[in-house]
């Protein structure tokens, strides 16, 4: 289907990387959109072309209700009253992913989930390129999809957040994957977790091949499931599964052994699942199995994702700053094997999530919890006997450096958004690395 944007009043919401990519997309088509940002001083303001009309400081602007088409950046909630009013007036509101999907003719692999998206998307990009594809990776991983549009591409790998899926309606994926679904971004969704889950599930609606995590008990009745192929991973009854009868779990497809985890650099069940689903995607794309296995054997963790920064004098320091929800902290704790004390750095903006699921884990572990940031005091009350409140990350690391002993593991796995004290999780992780080098 061909879309004609000429003669339409087009408005872009947000001056982040996504917003800038949308401006450039329309300018290449000879169309001048307008743009609004909620901030009075957006960091990317200098990137706005001089001939583009803009408004700063608030979304409550007449341009919204005068528009024919609004392209909304993922950081802006779709549930703002003025946007609800715009929809009621019949104004079309879409994401940059929707714009992208209208332009692409080659296969798309869409990857979403609460945790693990960037890791799996990067694995698949490497496997695809090794298999001879001209593959491009973009989306939530940090490169807007409109920036990777290429007429010579023969495959796109797209990492998708729930925010990006909210206003995406015509994404026709060759393969769609939901890695996992657990509580996150509850403060974004008026109807809570089920609304967040349903948004994630929408990635399957127009997909050809749907890869599902059997542990999440996906309700297929909620998905437009006509003419779809379903592939499962996770449990013992899944197509792709992990056999854990030995010290080194083995990855299987059906009853056939694929890979022994002793042969790979990554460790922890969350990483074994990431490799498992990458194998499922690779097989569905008919990438040569040997290419996939060779890439996965040599793959190491991405920065800020259970990244071992230092292992000296019997003490391991692990940077898992990408942990921005409860489930990711739970997974990180379950991946640690130590005879000493786990010293967990937990805190930031909890996004109204329920952290009580960590109670039982804390009770069974030899652990000391250092709670910091905006919700640090609240988090310290989950397991008061093992917790201490510290104002910020720096003070927490200084305190830990005085208490740590040989055999201990220091884990930054905050389980929270970083935006209360940092620009993003990368800045938080980089500070942690800097402090380790300076203090320990």
Curated annotation (Swiss-Prot):
Protein location: Cytoplasm
Gene Ontology cellular-component annotations: cytoplasm
Keywords for this protein: ATP-binding, Cell cycle, Cell division, Cell shape, Cell wall biogenesis/degradation, Cytoplasm, Ligase, Nucleotide-binding, Peptidoglycan synthesis
Main location, first listed in the record: cytoplasm
Protein residues bound to ATP: 113-119
Pathway per the UniProt entry: Cell wall biogenesis; peptidoglycan biosynthesis
GO biological process, one term: cell wall organization
Protein name: UDP-N-acetylmuramoylalanine--D-glutamate ligase
EC number: 6.3.2.9
Domain of life: Bacteria
Function, as annotated: Cell wall formation. Catalyzes the addition of glutamate to the nucleotide precursor UDP-N-acetylmuramoyl-L-alanine (UMA).
SUPFAM superfamilies: MurCD N-terminal domain (SSF51984), MurD-like peptide ligases, catalytic domain (SSF53623), MurD-like peptide ligases, peptide-binding domain (SSF53244)
Recorded family membership: Belongs to the MurCDEF family.
Pfam families: Mur_ligase_C (PF02875), Mur_ligase_M (PF08245), MurD-like_N (PF21799)
Keyword Translocase in annotation: no
One Gene Ontology MF term: ATP binding
The reaction(s) this protein catalyses: UDP-N-acetyl-alpha-D-muramoyl-L-alanine + D-glutamate + ATP = UDP-N-acetyl-alpha-D-muramoyl-L-alanyl-D-glutamate + ADP + phosphate + H(+)
């Amino acid at each position: 289907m061909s879309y004609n944007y000429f003669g339409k009043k087009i408005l872009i919401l947000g001056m982040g990387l996504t917003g800038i990519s949308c401006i450039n997309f329309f300018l290449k088509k000879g169309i001048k959109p307008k743009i609004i940002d909620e901030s009075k001083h957006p960091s990317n303001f200098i990137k706005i072309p001089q001939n583009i009309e803009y408004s700063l400081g608030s979304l409550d602007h007449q341009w919204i209700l005068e528009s024919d088409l609004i392209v909304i950046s993922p950081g802006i909630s779709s549930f703002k009253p003025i946007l609800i009013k715009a929809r009621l007036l019949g104004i079309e509101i879409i994401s940059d992913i929707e714009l992208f999907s209208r332009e692409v003719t080659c296969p798309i692999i869409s990857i979403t989930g609460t945790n693990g998206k960037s890791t799996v998307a990067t694995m698949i990009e490497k496997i695809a390129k090794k298999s001879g594809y001209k593959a491009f990776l973009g989306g939530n991983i940090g490169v807007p999809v409109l920036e990777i549009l290429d007429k010579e591409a023969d495959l796109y790998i797209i990492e998708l957040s729930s925010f990006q899926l909210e206003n995406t309606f015509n994404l026709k994926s060759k393969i769609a994957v939901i890695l996992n679904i657990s509580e996150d971004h509850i403060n974004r969704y008026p109807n809570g977790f089920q609304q967040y889950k349903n948004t994630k599930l929408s990635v399957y609606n127009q997909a050809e091949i749907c890869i599902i995590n059997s542990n999440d008990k996906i309700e297929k009745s909620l998905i437009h499931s006509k003419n779809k192929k379903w592939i499962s991973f996770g449990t013992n009854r899944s197509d792709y599964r992990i056999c854990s009868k030995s010290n080194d779990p083995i990855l299987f497809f059906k009853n056939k052994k694929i890979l022994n985890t002793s042969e790979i650099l990554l460790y922890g069940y969350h990483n074994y699942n990431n490799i498992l689903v990458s194998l499922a995607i690779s097989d569905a794309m008919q990438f040569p199995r040997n290419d996939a296995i060779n890439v996965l054997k040599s793959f190491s963790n991405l920065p800020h994702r259970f990244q071992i920064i230092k292992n000296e004098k019997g003490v391991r320091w692990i940077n898992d700053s990408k942990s921005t929800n409860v489930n990711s902290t739970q997974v990180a704790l379950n991946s640690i094997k130590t005879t000493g004390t786990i010293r967990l750095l937990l805190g930031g903006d909890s996004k109204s999530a329920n952290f009580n699921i960590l109670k039982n884990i804390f009770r069974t572990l030899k652990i000391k919890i250092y709670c910091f940031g905006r919700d640090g005091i609240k988090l310290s009350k989950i397991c008061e006997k093992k917790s201490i409140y510290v104002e910020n990350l720096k003070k927490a690391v200084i305190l830990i450096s005085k208490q740590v002993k040989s055999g201990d593991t220091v884990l930054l796995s905050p389980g929270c958004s970083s935006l209360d004290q940092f620009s993003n999780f990368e800045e938080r992780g980089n500070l942690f690395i800097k402090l380790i080098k300076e203090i320990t």
